[in-house]
């Protein structure tokens, strides 16, 4: 019987909730494995020896995160970066746009709901922050990556089952646009304008990018069956991260917009106006992957991890 351990680092524990959302299917998996460590689900502290598979959720945001990640790697035969935060840094990675001092000042002193008359920032017995959020693979060796925020329960089941059967887990290496059934122009995608998500009325059948919405599908791995675009009828935000063919998800999307934007047909819009149409550029293109980008921090903050 295989021994599985899980842990959470710089994250929200949502991937563990998705694991629990397997419901009865989780019982089938637990018949084949022994869950020996999972602080989210069990009252445990010490990391055990001789772990067969370790699932580590979350990126590295503190010295404690780094220590636990290294200890899990030392004790485990196989390490899985579990979820987008572990693989790419996730939404917490947007903190890389600010210094630790700015983040702590905001969190403990200046938010509207904060009551801290003494202006004290916790420091005693609180793990020190690293200088930036870092993906797991940049601090330890990772055997498999397992994206989404959080991964769908059925995907978790398929990956764990494959590993238990000593098979390679199969993850899609196509992007969303390659599998999305929304209708595209026979001439290819041409974007004549850019809208924010609340503007206009979304056509439920037509390509969202052609309608002017910043849909990250062209730069995002197709492992969720285009759930947002087809079920929620909202643009993809890129939570699965890029395919193996893409080095930088945001750069890929910027390149796609530059290629598809309607700048030659009667010069409908000056291409120089394109950046001004995107209100939150980093949040739009790097919401989930900034720490793994070619430029993972603001250039005046480009320091070592600790």
Swiss-Prot record:
EC number: 1.12.99.-
UniProt superkingdom: Archaea
Statement: the UniProt record of this protein carries the keyword Oxidoreductase: yes
Signal peptide: none
GO molecular function annotations of the record: iron-sulfur cluster binding; oxidoreductase activity
Keyword field: Oxidoreductase
Induction: By selenium deprivation.
Family the entry assigns: Belongs to the [NiFe]/[NiFeSe] hydrogenase small subunit family.
Quaternary structure and partners: The F420-non-reducing hydrogenase vhc is composed of three subunits; VhcA, VhcD and VhcG.
Protein name in UniProt: F420-non-reducing hydrogenase vhc subunit G
Protein source organism: Methanococcus voltae
